Amino acid sequence: MIKIIKEAQVRSEEDNRNLRETVAGIIGEIRGRGDAALKEYNEKFDGCTRESLRVSREEIDAAYKELGEQELADLKAAHHNIEAFANAQRQTVKPLDNFSPEPGVFLGHRIIPVESCCCYVPGGNYPLYSTALMLATPAKAAGVKRITACSPVVRGTGHINARTLVAMDLAGVDEIYALGGAQAIAAFSYGTESIKPVDIIVGPGNRFVTEAKRQCYGQVGIDFVAGPSEVLVIADGKASAKVVAADLLAQSEHDVNAKGILLTTDEAFGKSVIEAVEEELKILDTAKIARQSWDTFGEIGVVDSLDEAVQYANEYAPEHLELNVEDPDALIPKLVNYGSLFIGQNTAEVFGDYASGTNHTLPTLRAARYTGGVWVGTFLKTCTHQSMTPEASARIAPLVARMAHGEGLSGHAAAADERK
């Protein structure tokens, strides 16, 4: 049984009716008035009065000049790892042809990239330019022909953050648009005068973006509906309290709704992490947000065994899961529900956020029970095909006709009988 030594508040069930109605109204405006509505929302929410929503090549080139040599080198290094892993993953997704379950019946599948995608890169509290690399790079590796991206402008400037623009360009984005929010999701779902709709939209955003993705799903594909960021750390008493505290606060600083959880087999260690968190908050630049998040949703529990921690992790299905224990390899086979796994004290969760090569766009709110994060396969379709010899067609037709009659579908049976 887990003993809680630092308790989180229960996340209240938010009344989403107003949110749903607001987002539905925005979507309706974009569908009805197109670019005119987009520009109005751009000005209302971001103070942006730019005439052209599409970012020009000149703007992108100017963004490169704003970056220092080290900043550009860092972006290129991170992109290298993300691209290398995406390309390696692509090689694991193979076509299948001429599989024959019985004589004369030939089955297979093709791996086909979607034609177009939109990569939504958040602005908000922090310009998450790393997200541009995480979204567009696997799309490029998948072979998507038209990769678009959008991000809100830096308020009052009319321009997207320079690092974000450069990251989009490095990752191979074909079209960049200066807009965000629910209105951006609607535009790329239904299209406007200046924006052609896409096949799939990927990327995180605020609750308005998330609700818009939910409402537009079906008209457009999405990666998943994401909630606040979360990390679960499993640690024994031999871990570093300072390291664990830093990892918990790295998650907490995302926003006031982020959640950091520690499960440990050592109560004294858990208490030392609480102390280390307090010390770190004294010097953290983002302490205001991190403090509110940690006080509200941070949690530390003491487990009787690491197996109990594993059981909890599988039920919770965290976005990020850290194994900060002496023998992490013993736990890995037992873990089945997580967005991304970080093995051992050397492997900080923030490394995956930026540059190790795995993707940081991951499922939250227990969605890791049924899906993984964004990867090259997000942009690929597995499409089956089949062919038959005349002999096989005649042989299988009576079977199909009998089954069709059993379901009361005489038209199906007739179509099968024509092949006898």
What residue ranges belong to the model's regions?
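Short acidic-hydrophobic, aromatic-tinged amphipathic segments that line or gate anion-handling sites
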Residues: 4-7, 175-180, 300-305
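Alpha-helix C-terminal capping segments
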Residues: 134-145, 169-171, 189-196, 213, ...
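Conserved small-residue-rich beta-alpha loop and adjacent elements
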Residues: 96-166
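C-terminal core of ALDH-fold dehydrogenases
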Residues: 314-420
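Conserved NAD(P)+-binding/catalytic subdomain of aldehyde/semialdehyde dehydrogenases
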Residues: 172-259
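A glycine- and small/hydrophobic-rich beta-loop-beta segment
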Residues: 254, 262-338
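N-terminal Rossmann-like NAD(P)+-binding subdomain of aldehyde/semialdehyde dehydrogenases
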Residues: 1-115
